[in-house]
Design a protein with these regions (language model features):
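Pocket-forming structural segment of enzyme catalytic cores
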Residues: 1-69
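Acyltransferase
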Residues: 64-122
């Protein structure tokens, strides 16, 4: 998160850096010339990780919601497992699950805050 957007309605209370689940490498691109789009956060793999259009819509290119079986369930889909291994190598599913478990409490905390903030702007 870019700290200059600390007053944002959804993400203003988030730390400037936080953990989230990103499974694939698909991403929104080419928004640089759109003056109505504000980039709120990036990651090493995805420039437009969090963005918003005016004050009407947000784009979030990751999963902030996660359960203890999310990675194992998604890993049952052959295409998903292959995509993960193509990006992160052999045994990626197991390593990814370990990291998800390690960060689950914080990710769930952030998911709850995002939901609370979203309800405030409705």
């Amino acid at each position: 998160m870019d700290s200059k957007y600390s007053n944002d309605h959804l993400f203003g209370e988030f730390n400037s850096s936080f953990k989230a689940l990103q499974w694939h490498s698909y991403e929104v691109q080419g928004l640089e010339s759109n003056n109505n789009v504000t980039l709120l956060g990036s990651s090493p793999s995805t420039k437009y990780q969090i963005f918003k259009y005016k004050n009407h819509a947000y784009g979030i290119q990751f999963h902030i919601e996660i359960k203890d079986n999310t990675v194992s369930q998604w890993g049952c889909v052959p295409e998903y497992k292959k995509a993960l291994e193509d990006s992160l190598g052999k045994d990626a599913l197991k390593k990814f699950d370990v990291k998800a478990q390690e960060n689950m409490k914080l990710m769930n905390f952030n998911a709850e805050n995002l939901y609370k903030n979203f309800k405030k702007i409705l």
